[in-house]
Swiss-Prot record:
This is Phosphatase and actin regulator 4B. It comes from the Eukaryota. One of its GO terms (cellular component) is lamellipodium. Keywords: Actin-binding, Cell projection, Cytoplasm, Developmental protein, Neurogenesis, Phosphoprotein, Repeat. One of its GO terms (molecular function) is protein phosphatase 1 binding. Binds ppp1ca and actin. It comes from Danio rerio (Zebrafish). InterPro entries: RPEL_repeat. Residues 1-12, 138-153, 184-221, 229-241, 605-615 have a biased composition (Basic and acidic residues). Regulator of protein phosphatase 1 (PP1) required for neural tube and optic fissure closure, and enteric neural crest cell (ENCCs) migration during development. Acts as an activator of PP1. During neural tube closure, localizes to the ventral neural tube and activates PP1, leading to down-regulate cell proliferation within cranial neural tissue and the neural retina. Also acts as a regulator of migration of enteric neural crest cells (ENCCs) by activating PP1, leading to repression of the integrin signaling through the rho/rock pathway. The lineage of its organism: Eukaryota, Metazoa, Chordata, Craniata, Vertebrata.
Length: 754
């Protein structure tokens, strides 16, 4: 690792030295002056693009290749392109380095990718940065020189945090999470031997091993794994180691009162990874109690996860990152390895506190990964009661829908585990769609049991759910399939009031079916994070129609409008409505009322039959009520009719034609008379010729004429060579005999060729 980074730094320095003088043979002269940079800018002969040297290209290619080697490995593993290969090439050759492993099994992939940044810093710098943060440390831990494993374990959280933060998210495959959580739970139950290998080597100093690390070949960059011949041998060695190294719970409890730095909120603190018991503290050896049904699950898990060779993160990052500052004890226990191993001393294991809300952690994708996937969620232990905070949505419970009892738990729960679960606690059922695996997958920590249950029953993929943080101390309920951060606390209080007023519904869907969305509820199916569809149970327009039919005097339109045509629309526009949108909405409402309540179109002409047909669904108790409604409809109609323009206004606006046929005939006759008078007053052609207005005859004279060429004669264009020779001969004769020339200048007379 150091060798690789030294190469990169050396190439950076050579890039800087060679890139400056790549194009020129000689370096530019150094001029000391205030305006010396202006001479460098305004040199047009220097403005051509310089060729980049071969070394520069090779160096940049090597750098790009090395950078690209680091990044996409975890994404390729997630997509199934790469398979995880065991790194046992470098395990035996460099066994002196404390391996960054846990029980000889693998890390999740993201830590392996981020180890490339770990070894860049010097040991003094890393210890200076890490140690003052986690304040109380044991004396023997502080006295000895930090080993290489401590250095790497300390730098692991920060380096991987920076590296993953640059990539904009951390997506780890669910199989890696399963392996990590399963083996993590088993390790802590067996005595906290997360980094016992590292702490057992106090004699290895960092300074002498620097040179040895620099000369390591490339395959040894990855961390080495200790190999055991079989699973049972490794398990026995872990159990023997775990009796000596137990984390001190008092030291953990004191350190919790110190504020955690925000930079490392994703990863566990350093003392949680590499802590050793203080001398004199009581460290009881814990022997794991195995259930008879458990070893098959655990052995299948161990064999599956020991075959993969990636380095394993030692502490569950979601469980240990955020602890309440009020001195609540933090645990290192995770979920048991498929409920197989149960701690012998439950008093030594304080329960896991639920994490704080999401704004403490910098990377919500890790939290979302824990709550996603096809794993069965079975809580390990109930969390201590926290002060109630209104973050869980209120669902309407069916009185018949009793919470699940302990007897209805999955069969993988042993009797001891069932005894630990309180009576009122309700376990969420596993998701229905994915097929059951061959071995029971391990469960994540207690803090994430609030799972989106109906995730697998949707036909389209849901986005990554936001994590649900903790339950209130009341008995938990089935969470609805939605995010809980979608609305504020005030809306939840309103929803509580609505839920108290409404009676419970007649039927609730079973937890394994798709949830039914009730009317007026804020529950929604999340298709995309940017688009939330809030379905209503009934048509909202139909509900409004029913309300308006039952309370006609409260509606704004004074009952349904029975008759309305285009002219009344025009009158509404003439009356200058408050806005076009309001008039359009009003028009649509009245049209919907009319169409939904009227069975046939010919009733449009008869308002009384319309009134009967519209209110046929309602029972009239008395004739007075019927008359009142009829008069109300009549007043609405007369009001609408009184708003119409008169016939005179329509005639003035050329909309309505006059209905009198005699007037129309008289108008036509008047037009004809005017036209005939104009035509009768027109003068004849003879009068116009006599008055010299018309100067042409009414006939055409035809004469015969010969064709001729109107173009001018150009005889020089038609000369033959004989004509040209005759012209030259005549010209020469004229010059020689007839042209008067001075005798002295006759020699200069120019003659043409014959």
């Amino acid at each position: 690792m150091e060798n690789r980074d030294d190469e990169v730094e050396h190439q950076h320095s050579t890039m800087g030295s060679e890139g400056g003088t790549a194009g020129d043979g000689t370096p530019p002269p150094k001029r000391k002056g205030k305006f010396s940079t202006l001479g460098k800018i305004f040199k047009p002969w220097k403005w051509r693009k310089k060729k980049s040297s071969e070394k520069f290209k090779e160096t940049s290619e090597v750098l790009e290749r090395k950078m690209s080697m680091r990044r996409p490995r975890q994404e390729l593993i997630e997509q199934g392109v790469l398979k995880e290969l065991p790194d046992n090439e470098s395990g035996e050759a460099h066994g002196h380095k404390a391996p960054y492993v846990k029980n000889g099994h693998t890390l999740p992939v993201g830590v392996g990718g981020s180890l490339a940044l770990e070894q860049v810093h010097s040991p003094s710098e890393s210890e200076f940065r890490i140690n003052p943060v986690w304040l109380p440390q044991p004396e023997d831990r502080r006295a000895r020189a930090p080993s290489d494993g401590d250095h790497r374990g300390a730098l692991g959280p920060r380096a991987s945090n920076q590296d993953d933060g640059r990539r904009g998210g951390w997506s780890v495959g669910t199989e890696d999470w399963k392996n990590n959580l399963a083996w993590h739970g088993e390790d802590i139950r067996r005595g906290g031997r997360a980094h016992a290998e590292m702490d057992k080597r106090p004699g290895l100093m960092k300074a002498p091993s620097e040179d040895g690390r620099r000369t390591r070949p490339e395959p040894d960059w990855k961390p080495t794994l200790p190999r055991h011949s079989s699973v049972e041998e490794g398990r026995g060695r872990r159990e023997s180691d775990s009796s000596q190294y137990l984390p001190n719970s008092e030291m953990m409890r004191d350190t919790l009162r110190e504020p955690l730095p925000p930079k490392q909120s994703i990863m566990p603190p350093k003392w949680l990874m590499t802590s050793t018991p203080e001398p004199g503290s009581d460290s009881l050896p814990r022997t794991p109690v195995h259930n008879p049904a458990a070893p098959s699950f655990c052995s299948s898990n161990s064999s599956s996860s020991s075959s993969a060779g990636k380095p394993l993160r030692n502490v569950s990052s979601a469980g240990a990152n955020t602890a309440p500052p009020g001195g609540a004890p933090l645990t290192t226990s995770s979920a048991p390895c498929s409920m197989g191993t149960i701690p012998n001393h439950p008093s030594k294991q304080p329960p896991m506190p639920p994490p704080k809300p999401i704004n403490r952690s910098n990377n919500p994708a890790i939290m979302a990964e824990l709550t996603q996937g096809g794993m069965n969620l079975v809580p390990a232990k109930p969390s201590p009661p926290m002060p109630p905070k209104r973050t869980t949505p209120v669902t309407k419970r069916n009185p018949e829908d009793s919470p699940l009892t302990i007897a209805s738990l999955p069969s993988i729960l042993s009797e001891d585990m069932r005894a630990n679960i309180p009576g009122g606690y309700q376990l969420p059922p596993p998701p229905p769609s994915p097929p059951l695996p061959t071995h029971i997958p391990p469960s994540p920590p207690r803090a994430h049991t609030h799972h989106l249950l109906h995730q697998h029953s949707y036909p389209y993929p849901l986005p990554q759910p936001l994590p649900v943080h903790f339950d209130p101390p009341s008995p938990p309920e089935d969470p609805p399939a939605r995010d809980e951060d979608d609305y504020s606390d005030e809306e939840e209080e309103e929803e509580d009031d609505e839920d108290d007023e409404e009676p419970p519904p007649d039927h609730l869907p079973s937890p394994q079916s798709q949830p039914e969305l009730e009317p007026r509820s804020r529950r929604c199916l999340v298709g995309e994070l940017s688009v939330s569809v809030i379905p209503e149970g009934n048509n909202s327009s139909e509900e409004e129609e029913d309300e308006e039919d039952q309370h006609p005097e409260e509606s704004d339109s004074d009952g349904p409008v029975l008759y309305k045509d285009d002219e009344s629309d025009e009158d509404e526009e003439d009356d200058s409505p408050p806005s076009a949108l309001a008039s359009r909405v009003k028009r649509k409402d009245t049209l919907a009322l009319k169409l939904s309540s009227r069975p046939s179109a010919p009733d449009r002409q008869a308002p009384e039959r319309q009134a009967k047909s519209e209110h046929s669904g309602l029972s009239w108790q008395s004739k007075e009520q019927w008359e009142a409604i009829r008069t109300q409809i009549g007043t609405a109609l007369t009001r609408r009719l009184s708003q119409r323009p008169t016939a005179e206004e329509l005639e003035q606006r050329n909309i309505l034609q006059p209905k009198n046929e005699a007037d129309r005939q008289a108008e036509v006759r008047e037009i004809k008379r005017r036209l005939t008078r104009k035509l009768s007053q027109r003068p004849t052609v003879a009068e116009l010729q006599a008055r010299k207005i018309l100067r042409f005859h009414e006939y055409v004279e035809v004469t015969s004429a010969q064709d001729y060429d109107r173009r001018a004669d150009k005889p020089w264009t038609k000369l033959t060579p004989a004509d040209k020779a005759a012209i030259r001969k005549e010209l020469n004769e004229f010059k020689s005999s007839e042209m008067e020339v001075h005798e002295e200048s006759r020699i200069y007379t120019r003659f043409h060729r014959p």
